Amino acid sequence: MEDTTQWLSDASTAIHISLVSPSESGLQHVATFNPRHTYSIFGDDEKIFGYQDLKVNLRYRANDMRPHLNISYSKKSGTINELEPTDVAAILDEGNHLPKIAFAKARDFEESSKQLSDDWTPPGKLHTTFDSPEGQYEIWCGNLADPAVKQLNSRLQIFVPLFIEGGTYIGQDPDEDSAELDLSDADRWTFFSLYQKRKVGDKTAYVFVGYSTIYRFYYFQPPTPPASPQSDEWELPNGNMDLGELPCRTRLSQFIILPPFQGKGNGARLYKTIFEHYHKIPQTYEFTVEDPNEAFDDLRDICDLQFLRKMPEFNNLLVDTNIKIPKKGFLPKLIIGSSLLEEIRLRAKIAPRQFGRVLEMHLMSKLPVSVRPTMAIEDQPAATKADQHEAKVWGLIVKQRLYRHNKEVLSQIEPAERVEKLDDTLHGVGLEYARILAAVDRSDKYEGQTTASSKRKLDADEITEDLSNKKARVEDA
């Protein structure tokens, strides 16, 4: 059997994604980067067979994100051990990973860039603008039922499997092999896109930075007794009900900041903008996140804690150091202000488990330095009995949540082993919280260095031109 190693290419290395910005002198390079994951497209081994010096160049026009695919190589194999060379273009086309326009000729891609008008704006409506050390940014918001927003999503959706672990496309059924996408509920999807405005020559150009998609679920409220009828007359409700007025649970589904723009606070700005937007909407009862990975969990924890700390009622929550911990039986309330916890959570519109974790972080940050978990290697001051008692109460608060979350597994092991496992988990949780709290401190210091005018909501009288009436150009795909 012939050795095929020389004909194997690592898909994550072979694929080069680049942003190019249109200018009078042609397309200017903005950034190039590689994907993180390719297994959902090219298999678990993330290999492409049949080529040497393979380069899969996926260029994006940095403003409207029109893609262009170009594949090059020095040698292509024949059939080896009954293996045919991987048809990369066919996989990307037939799997609906890229729109048809991505497979057009390079000349068409370059010529169409010259035809873009100087007053081009992203699809949707301008939602927020803010300044940062890297320049001016804009966040645009639209509905997936809008053809221009739908087109942008079809161009960007390949980033989901390439950068989100286990990510799937909107409308994709993960249990089906079909590549067809069902967008019948497009009107429930909201699309937030983040752009940087850059100077290209003597003109200003948009450069795409990242995006997030949001889905609305109906929020089932606890049943309440119906009001007593005022008369014997009864009529069916009007059928012209606005579904947007119904109570909903808002779920953040996809969230991507392209690699060249990471580590600059862009993810936090986008997340906070989205969260604050939905928090102000009366119909939103809860804001949730779909299967967050570890990196996004950190971002979410930092932003949620900063948001909650702006609520005086949350800041007043403290570990109750005056309680006595019984050796047996039920534990007393461990938090001063515990009767307000659910009220605060509902006002914040944060999901129960997330609220519990962030509350634990906040309470830990108030522990005496002598007993507060830390990543630092410096010696801590000696702990008093009062310090140790406060730390023990905080530990019980965390263990209560851990036990509830893992009750089924923990109930199957012996009590002594159960206590040991909870203690080990508590130690790990403390170190994790210490890492996140350190990031919160860094973020607070960074935000303190920016001026209050770095971000502003757009008021009607600030807009000299009605951008919402400007139609974004929709190409063939």
From Swiss-Prot:
Arranged from A to Z, the UniProt key words for this protein are: Acyltransferase, Chromatin regulator, Cytoplasm, DNA damage, DNA repair, Nucleus, Transferase
Instruction: Tell me a GO biological process for this protein.
Output: DNA repair
Recorded GO cellular component terms are:
chromosome, telomeric region; cytoplasm; nucleus
The UniProt annotation puts the region (Interaction with histone H4 N-terminus) at 44-46, 215-217
Cellular localization per UniProt: Cytoplasm; Nucleus
Q: What is its main location?
A: cytoplasm
Q: What is stated as this protein's family in its record? A: Belongs to the HAT1 family.
Q: What is this protein called?
A: Histone acetyltransferase type B catalytic subunit
Name the species this protein comes from: Gibberella zeae (strain ATCC MYA-4620 / CBS 123657 / FGSC 9075 / NRRL 31084 / PH-1) (Wheat head blight fungus)
Question: What gene does the UniProt entry assign to this protein?
Answer: HAT1
